[in-house]
């Protein structure tokens, strides 16, 4: 099995474990108590597909969970710009530190810090990312001719750069340190058009410990709620710190 497949399996298993550990009724929208308990049962029994390269990623009795990542940074054919540049930055930082360590005096403590600003993030980017990847995985579902009765898309928000402020009518605003899809009425209307193909949407962000579950057929009732929503990009820096000492052999 290739390293890429092993890495992907690890990501999918970690995402599934996050759902199992953090699934609670307050994070579910449009689900009855019975449907919530059913979802818990499915998640507990779910396993990675033994055919790693085939649809779907995760299976359970008469059902599937298909996992994919979404981003609020810009994307191109190579994927999310933030993820790619972060990987390059980390690798280059490690290389520079090791070079400095190699040229240092014996038993001299070497400490290096490397800093770069985050890429630009936006609400538009994450909506486009969700739509693009959703359509792609709908295509995989249709090609697979999968006949499962229970169908779930598991989206993983890969960044922490969009925060959400939700203000219900006549109430104070609540701030969430992640993108909250349950308040994105325009996108939910679009997702609702796939109600005959996918039953549940789960959006997770393990970094901000955020999880939302939406029963897609219940979306019309969700978007009737009178709320005001603001999605705000968060600006910051990515940093790496290294400490080491070249000792005598």
What feature does the model see in each segment?
Residues 1-51, 68-249:
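Metal-dependent nuclease catalytic core centered on acidic motifs
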Residues 54-55:
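Aromatic-lined ligand-binding clefts that engage carbohydrates, nucleic acids, or primary amines
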